[in-house]
A protein has these predicted regions:
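Catalytic cores and adjacent binding grooves of peptidoglycan-active enzymes
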Residues: 169-178, 182-286
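N-terminal secretory signal peptides that target proteins for export/translocation
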Residues: 1-12
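Bacterial N-terminal signal peptides
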Residues: 16-26
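Acidic/His-rich structured neighborhood in mature extracellular/periplasmic domains
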Residues: 103-118, 163-168, 172-176, 186-190
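Extended, low-complexity, intrinsically disordered C-terminal regulatory tails
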Residues: 137-164
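Active-site acidic/histidine clusters and adjacent loop/turn architecture
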Residues: 86-144
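N-terminal module-boundary/linker segments of secreted carbohydrate-active enzymes
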Residues: 34-71
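N-terminal Sec signal peptide cleavage junction
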Residues: 28-30
């Protein structure tokens, strides 16, 4: 008897599962979506023309974004070149230089650097000829590479320490009118920088129509001490010094470099010449 009851219960198990499965299917078959009929939809007519508007909006005008404070001192991707970049490269840490002259051994000591003297003065303010600053910033922007000034202003002590030859004692580094430099990443391509300098005078509006500034000539005399004939216009004199030329204490690197001298002062409309009073008596000593 007990065995028959167990057998009947086992036979009923599949039937129970069938009933549960059926209930599950029927409960999921109903849809929750409501059916919309055309009569239940409403609309609203628009009573205006396409050009009509309730709010008058002024036409948009392009306004150039103001520069951030830190951007004002940028020249391309690098800090803007100022007169401070031209400070004398001398330092009292440099060793004494011994130079054998015809009759004696001469000792040359370097200056104390910017901590001991100022740049040249104009109207009692430190001064470097603006064309040098403008040119170097222009090069830095156009190339997006750093301009390295190897020699800007030289005080008399540093000047003779760098090069004691008599002819070097009358250069325009002494009066803030000359600069030696190269461009990082273009050290061995100075011709590209020369082309940029020539183009500068074509692009700047203030030189437009001024033939003496826009046209460069080549210096034909043999006293330039370089193998490449220099370029010049009314304002500047440009020299290419190859890596086998023009080495001194400030230019001990192995690259060719460029030298720009100022010939003409745009502001005063006068030629720029070396003078002893400017070189030796026109800067502060501390």
């Amino acid at each position: 008897m007990f065995q028959v009851i167990i057998a009947n219960k086992l036979n009923l198990l599949p039937l129970k599962f069938l009933v549960i499965f059926f209930i599950f299917l029927t409960s999921c078959s109903s849809s929750s979506k409501s059916t919309a009929t055309p009569s239940s939809l409403t609309g609203e007519y628009i009573y205006r023309h396409h050009e009509d508007s309730q709010i008058q909006v002024e036409p948009m005008i392009f306004v150039k974004r103001k520069t951030y404070p830190w951007e004002e001192n940028q020249s391309g991707a690098y800090p803007k070149i100022t007169k401070d970049f031209f400070r004398c490269k001398g330092t009292s840490l440099n060793p004494v230089r011994l130079v054998q002259k015809e009759k004696e051994l001469v000792r040359y000591y370097d200056c104390g650097g910017p901590q001991k003297h100022s740049l040249p003065l104009k109207n009692q303010k430190e001064f470097i000829y603006p064309i040098l600053i403008d040119l170097l910033n222009y090069i830095q922007v156009k190339t997006n590479k750093r301009v390295v000034i190897t020699c800007g202003h030289c005080c008399p002590d540093h000047n003779v320490y760098v090069d004691s030859s008599p002819s070097y004692q009358f250069n325009k580094h002494l009066i803030g009118a000359e600069v030696d430099f190269y461009v990082q990443g273009l050290e061995y391509q100075p011709e590209k920088i020369i082309e940029l300098i020539l183009n500068y005078y074509q692009e700047m509006p203030k030189y437009k129509g001024l033939k003496d500034f826009q046209e460069f000539k080549r210096y034909e005399k043999g006293d330039s001490k370089v193998s490449t004939k220099p370029w010049y216009n009314q304002e500047i004199f440009l020299k290419l010094i190859k890596k086998s030329e023009g080495r001194d204490f400030d230019n001990r690197h192995s690259y060719p470099y460029l030298c720009v001298q100022v010939r003409y002062d745009w502001e005063t409309k006068q030629k720029v010449h070396y003078s002893w009073s400017q070189a030796f008596g026109n800067f502060h000593r501390w």
